[in-house]
UniProtKB/Swiss-Prot annotation:
Phylogenetic classification of the source organism: Eukaryota, Fungi, Dikarya, Ascomycota, Taphrinomycotina
Stored SUPFAM superfamilies: P-loop containing nucleoside triphosphate hydrolases
Signal sequence annotation: none
Stored CDD domains: ArsA
One cellular-component annotation, GO: GET complex
Enzyme class at the top of the EC tree: hydrolase
Gene: get3
Residues bound to ATP: K27, G28, G29, V30, G31, K32, T33, T34, E231, N258
Protein name stated in the entry: ATPase get3
Length: 324
């Protein structure tokens, strides 16, 4: 006997009051930003304060709401408890490096220390991620929703706490082995290197990053919403993403399938052909993910831009589509 399918809505996320971090991700062009903005609008109805944060360098939040956002959180016009910000992790790390150089412009050791620190793959992005998380945590939002970069970047982003923990462990070992040598060279060159400060700062991050890592792996606090369309490549990408999320021990139990042609009575030949293809892949999604909430969102007649259009669209995530 087959199990009753789970409700095809994201209402389960609104009801899970313990959730702190929600990631929304998928392939480019599947409606990921529209979905994350809409989810944030719904979440703001049941939470005290919500932050929507884009880690996608394309930064579509500003376009979606028709308001310019930057790296500082600011309220979205029309809301009292929903804020947004757009950050570029790569730009964040560049700022950190420039700051370090300004503090020690004539220190030949600082370049060497940076090279040593960034010799570990992924450490630059991971450090930038640590800075972002530190800032976000200090703002004390009730719930944080990440509109992530297209799939590949998303998964790297989620693995950063692990990368950083491993990197800090390696760097701690390097400090004990090469610290005296660097200090000796520093003395010979007549410079006052801040290598101890650099390592101390990184070591200081370890505790908070370890805490973030634990939170990301806790299904009571963190979940990932997959967004796709009912086509082969998108389905393949979603399957790969779910497998990787599972390997990172990150909870995922919601899939939003966008741009569906749900009207069976259409007379348009192209629509009939496309609907037939969509139904084929939708059946596969339902078969593969029977323990997921699969939200079927229809193709809407106009572009979803602006607060009013997003608010209207957000209802489709909570109330299953019914043909009028």
């Amino acid at each position: 006997m087959s199990l009753e399918p789970l409700p095809g809505t994201l209402e389960n996320l609104l009801e899970q009051t313990s959730l702190k971090w929600i990631f929304v991700g998928g392939k480019g062009g599947v409606g990921k930003t529209t979905t994350s903005c809409s989810l944030a609008i719904q979440m703001s109805k049941v939470r005290k304060s919500v932050l929507l944060i884009s880690t996608d360098p394309a930064h579509n939040l500003s376009d979606a709401f028709g308001t310019k956002f930057g790296k500082e959180a600011r309220l979205i016009p029309g809301f009292e408890n929903l804020s947004a910000m757009e950050i570029d992790p790569n730009a964040s790390i560049q700022e950190m490096l420039e700051q370090s150089e300004q503090q020690n412009p004539n220190n030949p050791m600082s370049g060497m220390m940076q090279d040593l620190a960034f010799a570990i793959p992924g450490i630059d992005e991971a450090l930038a991620f640590a800075e972002v998380m530190k800032e976000v945590k200090s703002m004390n939002f009730d719930c944080v929703i990440f509109d992530t970069a297209p799939t590949g970047h998303t998964l790297r982003f989620l693995n950063f706490p692990t990368v950083l923990e491993k990197a800090l462990a390696k760097l701690s070992g390097l400090t004990s082995r090469f610290g005296p040598l660097i200090n000796q060279m520093s003395g010979m060159l007549g410079t006052n290197t801040n290598q101890e400060d650099i390592f101390a700062k990184m070591e200081g991050m370890r505790g908070s990053i370890s805490e973030v890592n634990k939170q990301f792996k806790n299904p009571d606090l963190t979940t990932f919403v997959c967004v796709c369309i009912s086509e082969f490549l998108s389905l393949y990408e979603t399957e790969r993403m779910i497998q990787e999320l599972t390997s990172y021990e990150i909870d995922t139990h919601n899939i939003v399938v966008n741009q569906l042609l749900l009207d069976p009575d259409t007379k348009c030949p192209q629509c009939i052909a496309r609907r037939k293809m969509q139904q084929k892949y939708l059946s596969q999604i339902e078969e593969l993910y029977e323990d997921f909430h699969i939200v079927k969102v229809p193709q809407v007649p106009s572009e979803v831009r602006g607060t009013e259009a997003l608010t209207k669209f957000s209802d489709l995530l909570i109330h299953p589509y019914v043909k009028e």
